[in-house]
Structure formats: structure tokens, C-alpha cells
Amino acid sequence: FNKRFGEKSAAEIIGFLNDYMSRMVNCISLAGGTVDKFEGDAIMAAWGVLRDESLDFEKLDHFSPEYKKAYTIHEKHKKEDAINAITAAIAMRYALMEYNKKAMEFTRAHEVEGDVKFKPMIRIGCGINTGRATVGFMGSNDKMEFTSIGDSVNLASRTESSNKPCGTDMLIT
């Protein structure tokens, strides 16, 4: 990221990031995801965090009908959330392909004019992991942020960072 934009103005970098983030967030939202945070050019998202489903069923007798019903619903949602996260990642790949196609056309048009303007081709890496996370507003009286923390979140982050050395754009654990 820094290599491509090192000589660009702050306004150009922010403009690019806003365009890129809008495209990616749209894919996440359409697949039922919730954006947790932006970290530089990275987006952290989660699925199932705003559902009213409670894990209180785990306190029930495991042989009771109430437990079985709640557990079945919970397992169904876990599978749906995983599929939706993968769907978002695939949609992000397609949105990025469309962006890169337009960026190439823009750059070619400006090369003909002898102008040095260009739009960079970009790649993304998606790291997908399923599991429990602690989710909520965290911080201090001065600043609170909605975020997700936990082992499953850390593994997703490490998985994402493995894309570049692996030569991939999506890794799923």
C-alpha cells in the first residue's frame, strides 16, 4: 500500500481509500456482515454479532427439548454466517476485478494523453475464520468503539496476513 501511494497527496490517498472501502463494505453489508473497524487499508468484519440469539441455552439441561431446539438454531446460524462471510469475500474479489478493469482503462486513457495520472491496480487478502468472539463497545469514557476480540478474531487476522506469502487472495481456516 505505502509503495503505491508514497508520493500521492493526503487527499488522493483518502479519496482512493473511501472509494475502495465503499466498494468492499457494500459487499460485506449485502452478505449480512457488520464492519467492525478500518485499520489503514484493512477492513475487519464479523457475521452474526447483531443477532438477538443468546447462548443461554448452554446452561440448559443438554437432554431437554429447549436445549436441542436452541442448539439446532445456533448451529444453523453458525453455518449461515460462515457461508455469508465467504460470499462477501467472493463478492469483494469481483468488485475488485471491476475496479482494476476501470483503473487500467483510466491509466491507458491518460497514457495516450501523455499524462502521468494513473489509478493503481490493487490486490486484497481475505482471512476467514469461524468461532466465538467477545463483541461490544470497548474503550474509555472519552472514546468507545464497537469491536470484536478473542482467539477466533486473532486467527482470522493471522490468516489474512498469510495471503501475501502464500500468493493467495483468500484463506479460510
Segments predicted by a language model, with ranges:
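Hydrophobic alpha-helical packing residues
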Residues: 17-20, 24, 92, 96, ...
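ATP-driven catalytic headpiece of P-type ATPases
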Residues: 65, 78, 87-90, 94, ...
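A short beta-strand->alpha-helix segment at the C-terminal rim
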Residues: 94-133, 160-173
